[in-house]
């Protein structure tokens, strides 16, 4: 049984995994949490932890909207409380995924993640009552939206401790309004027990191109799903036929860890070779400068700075500019 002295969010995660029959994972959680939140590995972690801990006690009465473009929590804050909250939330910058509106504080994130959700959501099997895994889920924006769409249990796994504390900050505002259905574990997919076959839907959005072994990643995703479960895959692609795969040099759009960019047709073939059925390309389009940009909450360089200033169809390195595709596939029964 979980230690009752754990922070509420961690205790809720233990309880949820037990409730969903994932006791094998529960045994691994203490070590995974200790590793993912290791102060020796992450020098800024104490500052993020302190910022979340200093958020003030909030009024019980609140209106929480997890199904709106901006994940929103409306509650009555004094001017002093709102100023304190905003200062603490800014200590967790940069905020990359969102947007959020928390107690009247609008967090205008680098990515308009709501636009991605609008492209993805119409093509999903209904999430009502489903168990969902969100691999590389950032600070949890899409996880909240999944619960807003009716998911019974959402587990976000992402190895970034900054994202973990951004999620916990949002959790502070949401409170228990989601019925403790949304959870975050600061680990990568490698920490998911092998052959788990526990989730009805698994998302991997913005992860595949960071993987030096993309087929291994697809098979890891497959093994998280129950028979008949659904995979939602979003990644960078290039234009071309079923044999087109591009591997950039040291950097792509200034990112150092980008490996394989297939065409959407090649990616569909990869999914089929990895044992998926009913593979569909449901969306494909260039990433727009309006969707990814610098803001007051993410003040560093963004997409506009990574493109050729003379030709926005090319990256700084001369490669095709970012283009993303969404594919949906099913694991056989």
Curated annotation (Swiss-Prot):
Organism this protein belongs to: Chromohalobacter salexigens (strain ATCC BAA-138 / DSM 3043 / CIP 106854 / NCIMB 13768 / 1H11)
Known partners and oligomeric status: Homotetramer.
Top-rank EC class of the record's enzyme: transferase
Binding annotation for carboxy-S-adenosyl-L-methionine: 97, 111, 116, 136, 158-160, 189-190, 205, 209, 324
This protein's name: tRNA U34 carboxymethyltransferase
Catalytic reaction(s) noted: carboxy-S-adenosyl-L-methionine + 5-hydroxyuridine(34) in tRNA = 5-carboxymethoxyuridine(34) in tRNA + S-adenosyl-L-homocysteine + H(+)
Top-level taxonomic group: Bacteria
Claim: tRNA processing is one of the keywords in the record: yes
PANTHER family with a match to the protein in the record: METHYLTRANSFERASE, TRNA U34 CARBOXYMETHYLTRANSFERASE
Function noted in UniProt: Catalyzes carboxymethyl transfer from carboxy-S-adenosyl-L-methionine (Cx-SAM) to 5-hydroxyuridine (ho5U) to form 5-carboxymethoxyuridine (cmo5U) at position 34 in tRNAs.
GO BP terms in the entry: tRNA wobble uridine modification
GO molecular function, one term: methyltransferase activity
Record has DNA repair as a keyword: no
Region forming the signal peptide: none
Alphabetically ordered keywords of this record: Transferase, tRNA processing
SUPFAM superfamilies reported in the protein's UniProt record: S-adenosyl-L-methionine-dependent methyltransferases (SSF53335)
Family statement: Belongs to the class I-like SAM-binding methyltransferase superfamily. CmoB family.
EC number: 2.5.1.-
Listed InterPro entries: CmoB (IPR010017), Mo5U34_MeTrfas-like (IPR027555), SAM-dependent_MTases_sf (IPR029063)
């Amino acid at each position: 049984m979980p230690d009752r002295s754990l922070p509420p969010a961690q205790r809720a995660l233990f309880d949820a995994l037990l409730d969903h029959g994932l006791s094998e994972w529960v045994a691994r959680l203490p070590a995974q949490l200790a590793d993912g939140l290791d102060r020796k590995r992450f020098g800024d972690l104490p500052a993020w932890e302190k910022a979340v801990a200093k958020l003030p006690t909030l009024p019980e009465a609140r209106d929480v909207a997890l199904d709106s473009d901006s994940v929103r929590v409306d509650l009555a804050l004094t001017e002093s409380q709102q100023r304190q909250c905003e200062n603490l939330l800014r200590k967790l910058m940069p905020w990359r995924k969102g947007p959020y509106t928390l107690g009247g504080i609008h967090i205008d994130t680098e990515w308009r993640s709501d636009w991605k959700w609008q492209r993805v959501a119409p093509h999903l099997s209904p999430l009502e009552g489903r168990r969902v895994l969100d691999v590389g889920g950032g600070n949890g924006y899409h996880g909240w939206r999944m619960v807003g769409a009716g998911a019974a249990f959402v587990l976000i796994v992402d190895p970034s401790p900054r994202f973990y504390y951004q999620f916990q900050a949002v959790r502070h505002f949401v409170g228990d309004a989601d019925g403790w259905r949304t959870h975050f574990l600061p680990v990568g997919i490698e920490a998911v027990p092998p052959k788990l076959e526990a989730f009805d839907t698994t998302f991997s959005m913005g992860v595949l191109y960071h993987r030096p072994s993309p087929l291994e990643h697809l098979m890891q995703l497959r093994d998280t799903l129950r028979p008949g479960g659904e995979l939602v895959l979003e990644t960078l692609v290039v234009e071309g036929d079923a044999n087109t795969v591009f591997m950039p040099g040291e950097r792509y759009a200034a990112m150092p860890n980008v490996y394989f960019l297939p065409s959407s047709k090649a990616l569909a073939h990869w999914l089929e070779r990895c044992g998926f059925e009913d593979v569909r390309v449901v969306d494909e389009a260039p990433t727009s400068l309006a969707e990814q940009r610098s803001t007051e909450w993410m003040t560093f360089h963004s997409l506009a700075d990574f493109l050729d200033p003379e030709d926005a169809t090319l990256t700084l390195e001369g490669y095709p500019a970012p283009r993303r595709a969404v594919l949906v596939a099913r694991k056989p029964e």
